UniProtKB/Swiss-Prot annotation:
Coiled coil: none annotated. GO terms for cellular component: periplasmic space. Homotrimer. This is Dissimilatory sulfite reductase SirA.
């Protein structure tokens, strides 16, 4: 028997589009006196409703007319699922019975695609205009500057709502592509979605207390393995869950069990955080609090980011205040993908609420072969054969910054306003590509697969808490001048290029309570992909809107760009970050973090100005020497134009100046002004200066003016 009511025919909705206007829906949830669809009421968001309310919506849906599913088709596709969930999901039963603590906020594809990344502002600024006559190019039924766009995500070719699909599963690919399959199988990509019973790190006990916590486990309070479809994540950073209705777990249950529908459903307290549970112990929190008095010390200090358990954060939620009601089709599946072998949507709906049935019909889970190569890949009958998707689908999440669009650079090229998707004050997970987009490396053609093997993305044990990707090309393969200097230094001889140029900066958890970007911590578990270090005493990588508080709760933080439009790293993140998951920190005595460093106290850096002073001790002598050598070479070059020397002496002068010029070229190509190897760089420049002085002495002692 069907447990859901079918949606009113879509054609009827098109005719009645104006009737579902966001301002006419009755609800108790209001904002500025207006109803807010989906906030405490069983309605989809106004972003989706606006799509449906457009009188010309049928002109924008390509699937029926062209056989191709485009952005708005994906958004409309979710309607029937939401009808089912509004009628059947436990959230609404708890709410109806007064056993819900916190307000649910519906989040659908309309919100995620059209609102995420401030895509609305992008749509407004993106004017499709014919340059010859000034008229708008009409390839959609929207007015110029109003056409919906998605900036935060790239759509996958197929969704969990597409039935039937042609997915065959990674094991089928592995029958012929053994090397690629084995590499993938041991990577974290293969572990992003796991069923209960697939967790060796806790002996398959999802309620086992983790690390030194009293009772904090992978699954939150009131959530049992038999009530979920899968967990999301690995021991590297965090664990979340997807419930039996394929809805993101943004809640926990107090004094009861979700599977029984007992107790009280509470917003947040839903995501296990390894960094908090294992490293950020009460003792470490107290240590940080001494230096940063506003750092959370007690459970209540974590505010809406925290919960009732040490190590269990609130993600996609504000503890006891509000939480997203968000199906996996709206969010999770974009990057933490899975697919079913159901042949019809009726089979799919009949299985919702029954996790065992959903698991039985799962044909693919994790970032599998077919997510990039297409369903069925190159096989006869498949729809792949090329690369329907790539890394950037999940790793190039942008955020549109309107202020940047209004700059001269943004007026010339609108993509200048494409900034990095943020989680509060830190770059979000999945922004490696959007960080790289604003870099000289990207402009030169570097892409993810330049350095990474997409099949083997994890180096070492996937159960480790350290972020260490597998690399197929090292920085020094291209940066030979830097390699030459770095191999001759003792200062950072055990460090890699990434130690300074790719600090852990990104947030997976949006753990706002522990984000202190000016102190380069502490919710930073993903490596940055900016590379360029800005040696400046004041300029910061991460900034709120001008004139606003630098508190992490301030809205609108962005990644700074330099005069060339490139992102850059400030000295605090480069030298003194604090990160328990950054192997370049943990394997090198904590670098210069005042909270992790094992170096002498004088090398524990507390602020950017202090670091700048230390760097200047390296760079100033190098720059001074460089200037002397360059000036000497220029003087000799001019003298040789007017001075005649014996052949043997001229040869000697030219050989000496060539050797000095080689040093100049090396230092210029290196570009660090001694930071990569201060003693060695200064030693080479000392030698170059000697060459110049010797050449000058030869001219002074043997030459005469050719014009005399």
């Amino acid at each position: 028997m069907k447990r859901w009511k079918t949606k009113t025919a879509l054609g009827v909705l098109f005719c009645l589009g104006s009737a579902v206007s966001a301002t006419t829906i009755a609800s108790d949830a209001k904002s500025d006196g207006k109803v807010v669809p989906g906030v405490g009421n069983k309605q989809q968001t106004h972003y989706t409703q606006d799509i449906l309310a457009n009188p010309k919506v049928s002109e924008n849906l390509m699937e029926k007319s062209r056989g191709v599913k485009t952005l708005q088709d994906y958004i409309v596709q979710e309607q029937e699922l939401f009808d089912f969930l509004f009628e059947n999901h436990p959230v609404f039963k708890y709410d109806a019975e007064g056993r819900l603590k916190g307000t649910y906020k519906v989040s659908d594809r309309g919100e995620e695609y059209l609102h995420g990344g401030d895509s609305v502002a992008y749509s407004k600024h993106s004017k499709e205009v014919n340059s010859t006559d000034g008229t708008a190019v009409r390839y959609s039924a929207y007015e110029d500057g109003q056409r919906p766009k998605a900036l935060q995500y790239r759509l996958g070719a197929k969704s969990i709502l597409d039935f039937p699909n042609k997915f065959v599963g990674p094991e089928k690919c592995g029958e012929c592509h053994g090397p690629q399959y084995e590499k993938w199988r041991r990577s974290r990509h293969s572990k992003t979605i796991r069923f209960p019973g697939e967790h060796p790190e806790v002996d398959n006990d999802l309620k086992k207390p983790m690390y030194t916590t009293k009772d904090t486990s992978i699954l939150p309070s009131g959530i049992t393995p038999d009530a979920i479809y899968a967990t999301v994540g690995t021991p590297r950073t965090k664990y979340g869950f997807i419930d039996a209705y394929l809805v993101r777990g943004t809640y926990h249950v107090k004094d009861g069990l979700l599977k029984d529908g007992t107790g009280t459903m509470v917003a947040g307290g839903n995501q296990f955080s390894r960094g908090w549970a294992e490293w950020l112990t009460p003792e470490m929190a107290a240590k940080i609090n001494k230096a940063i008095p506003s750092f959370p010390l007690k459970m209540e200090d974590f505010g809406t980011s925290g919960s009732h358990q040490w190590g269990m954060s609130s993600y996609g939620a504000k503890y006891e205040k509000e939480f997203l009601f968000q199906p996996a089709s709206s969010y999770c599946e974009m990057c933490h993908s899975f697919k079913f072998d159901f042949q019809t949507k009726e089979e799919f709906f009949a299985a919702l609420g029954n996790p065992k049935e959903l698991q039985k019909h799962t044909i693919s889970k994790g970032i599998t072969c077919e997510e990039c190569h297409g369903a069925g890949g190159h096989l006869d009958g498949g729809i792949g054969g090329g690369m329907p998707s790539n890394c950037e689908r999940c790793h190039q999440r942008f955020n549109f910054v309107e202020e940047l669009a209004e700059t001269p650079q943004g007026q010339e090229k609108l993509e200048y306003a494409f900034n990095v998707k943020m989680k509060s004050s830190c770059p979000s997970c999945g922004t490696e590509g959007s960080q790289m987009f604003a870099s000289a490396h990207y402009d030169k053609g570097m892409r993810c697969s330049t350095c990474h093997d997409p099949h083997e993305v994890t180096d070492g044990d996937w159960k480790s808490g350290i972020t260490k990707p597998k690399i197929i090309k090292e920085c020094t393969d291209c940066h030979t001048a830097q390699a030459e200097i770095a191999k001759n230094t003792n200062t950072h001889s055990n460090q890699t290029c990434q130690s300074c140029h790719m600090p852990n900066m990104g947030s997976c958890e949006n753990f706002t309570a522990i984000q202190f970007p000016d102190m380069a911590g502490f919710d930073n578990v993903r490596k940055s992909h900016m590379w360029k270090i800005d040696v400046d005493p004041l300029r910061k990588t991460l900034n709120p809107p001008e004139g606003k508080s630098r508190d992490a709760t301030t809205k609108g933080w962005t990644v700074a760009k330099d005069e060339n439009g490139y992102n850059y790293l400030d000295l605090m993140w480069t030298c003194a970050r604090t990160s328990a998951s950054d192997h370049d920190v943990t394997e090198n005595k904590g670098c210069h973090s005042q909270f992790q460093s094992e170096l002498e106290v004088g090398l524990h850096f507390e602020d950017q100005m202090e670091i700048y002073g230390e760097v200047q001790k390296w760079q100033k002598p190098v720059k001074d020497l460089f200037g002397q050598v360059l000036q000497g070479l220029q003087r000799i070059d001019k003298l040789l134009e007017v001075t005649q020397l014996p052949v043997d002496k001229k040869t000697e002068v030219l050989m000496l100046t060539d050797k000095a010029q080689d040093v100049i070229k090396l230092v210029e190509a290196d570009g660090s002004w001694g930071a990569h190897g201060p003693r060695y760089t200064q030693k080479r420049l000392d030698a170059a200066l000697t060459y110049v002085q010797q050449a000058q002495a030869i001219i002074d002692g043997n030459g005469y003016n050719a014009k005399m």
